[in-house]
Amino acid sequence: MNRRQYLIALVIAAIFSACGTKANTQGRQESLDGKWEVKLSETEDNSSTENVKITLEFNLAEKRFGGEGICNTYGGDIETLNSSKGTIRLGDVISTLVACDNMAYENALFDRLPEVRRFQMKEGKCYLYGEDAETPLLILIRQ
């Protein structure tokens, strides 16, 4: 193979590689898998947690979820998930037992997670809803 053919092959490989990377990134953006920042909802006062990042991470391969609350780490099982229908059911939350300020916010998070039944991806956010709720229980922002 002469030098010109080698350079052309290299450029073509780079183009295909770049296209594949973009497709994987876009697919990940539409997936629950990965780490998110948690907000209770857009209508609720989140000011007590402005300086604290509460996270929720989904590991779809292991069917687990978990994260960092205000004071405690937590986790549980993903009992059911149907990404094409936008349905999900999370198991009971297991957490460490550290007490601190803003426990009401953290307890609200732990109470809502098992109520989640469906999700909707929209504009880089994931909205988690209860069975018949029109207002999201939780709003997740990709990290």
Indicate residue ranges for each PLM-predicted region.
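Lipid interaction determinants
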Residues: 19-143
